[in-house]
UniProtKB/Swiss-Prot annotation:
It comes from Arabidopsis thaliana (Mouse-ear cress). PANTHER family: F-BOX DOMAIN-CONTAINING PROTEIN, F-BOX/KELCH-REPEAT PROTEIN SKIP4. Kelch repeats lie at residues 177-221. It comes from the Eukaryota. Pfam families: F-box (PF00646), Kelch_FKB95 (PF25210). The keyword Cell inner membrane does not apply. Transmembrane segments: none annotated. This is F-box/kelch-repeat protein At2g44700. SMART domains: FBOX (SM00256).
Length: 368
């Protein structure tokens, strides 16, 4: 998401790695923009929040269109979109990926893919961590198992077990760590974190929210160094990973789905049935409408970050193929100004025709 108050500078910005960028940003920022863009495009996106904290100029660069264009040419970002077919029992999952065609900055490919699941029959939360998907138990049967699927190589492996068995919980990625809150017994560790570098679990700050049911959520997201549990009626509860403090806020009285929300440049976006696309102003603790375009009251919507834009995916009945429906996609550019966030919608694209029984259940943003 770009900002009208902080345009990227053509020269004067970061170094050939995230470490050197932090150590001597002025030297890095003096390089030509084209070189800076290609360097930063190769840095894993989970380090971008760290780079953004170096300086305002660095933050503008990391969020600039030039970086997203460079990442696009490298094919760094992609979406994993999952459907379940409700016409059959047991229910089966069908997965597709949306990714850029090689050496293109605009054309996308939507194709069916094989997707392995952990053998344990529990229900799992699925969380995108760079190019990997973390499976953590999310059911009434507590489990300490962690499974990790690497989308680059199609490999599913077992990760280190959690410190305690957990049932329903809230999961989020903040600052190089995966946090798990809730789903514990009274005498157990209330929250823990998994360090992506050391590959180890450790106890995290104890949440001051004493009601453990607050972490039984419809969806979870991470922004502002917080992990947030979203519930339809109870609103949003956010856990601050720095000190365990928790904050509650209301959500609009409208319908939304767990696939219809995402975070872009540290801003939470949710698509509501009546209100449309909205964003959460964390400073004012208000929900605000994204203006500037019309989504025609789309239903069964999934959204995700895709090269700095919001990928908007929805279903509608097929007029040409009986007992089928169409999957459509359009990209929405986001511009933040002093008055709010405006969206610029690109042309819609029909990407697939699927059976009527398919229902979108996952929309994961992954990155290399």
């Amino acid at each position: 998401m770009s900002s009208s108050n902080e345009p990227p500078r053509k020269t004067d910005q970061p170094s050939s790695s995230s470490a050197s960028a932090s150590a001597s940003p002025s030297l890095f920022l003096s390089l030509p923009l084209e070189i800076i863009s290609m360097i930063l495009a190769r840095v894993p996106k989970r380090y971008y929040p760290i780079l953004c904290s170096v300086s305002k100029n660095m933050r503008s660069l990391v969020r600039s269109p030039e970086i997203h264009k460079a990442r696009s040419l490298l094919g760094k970002d992609y979406l994993y979109i999952g459907f379940i077919d409700e016409n059959y029992r047991p229910v089966y999952d069908y997965w597709y990926t949306l990714r850029r065609i090689e050496n293109s900055t605009t054309e996308n490919l939507f194709e069916s893919i094989e997707f392995p699941y952990p053998s344990e029959p529990n229900r799992f939360s699925m969380n995108a961590v760079g190019p990997k998907i973390f499976f953590i138990s999310e059911s009434c049967t507590p489990s300490s198992r962690l499974s990790i699927f690497d989308t680059r190589f199609g490999e599913l492996r077992q990760g280190p077990c959690l410190l305690v068995k957990r049932g329903y919980n809230c999961v989020g990625l903040v600052g190089g760590k995966v946090y798990v809150i809730g789903g514990y017994q009274d005498d157990e560790i209330a929250a823990e974190s998994f360090d992506l570098n050391t590959q180890t679990w450790e106890a995290a700050p104890i949440p001051d929210e004493k009601e453990s049911h607050r972490w039984i959520c419809k969806a979870n997201v991470s922004f502002d160094r917080k992990v947030c549990a979203l519930r339809s009626r109870e609103g949003m509860t956010c856990y601050d990973t720095r000190d365990g403090s928790c904050q509650r806020s209301e959500m609009p009285n409208d319908q939304w789905s767990r696939v219809g929300l995402c975070v872009i440049d540290n801003v939470l976006f949710v698509y509501f049935s009546r209100f449309g696309l909205m964003w959460y102003d964390s400073k004012l603790m208000l929900w605000r409408v994204v203006y500037g375009f019309d989504l025609d009251n789309a239903r069964s919507v999934g959204i995700g970050e895709y090269y700095g834009k919001l990928a908007f995916i929805w279903e509608k009945p097929s007029l040409n193929v009986s007992e089928s429906k169409e999957i459509w996609c359009r990209m929405i550019g986001l511009l933040r100004s002093e008055v709010g966030i405006h969206g610029a919608a690109e042309p819609s694209q029909l990407v697939e025709i699927v059976p009527n029984g398919y229902r979108m259940c996952h929309c994961l943003s992954l990155s290399g």
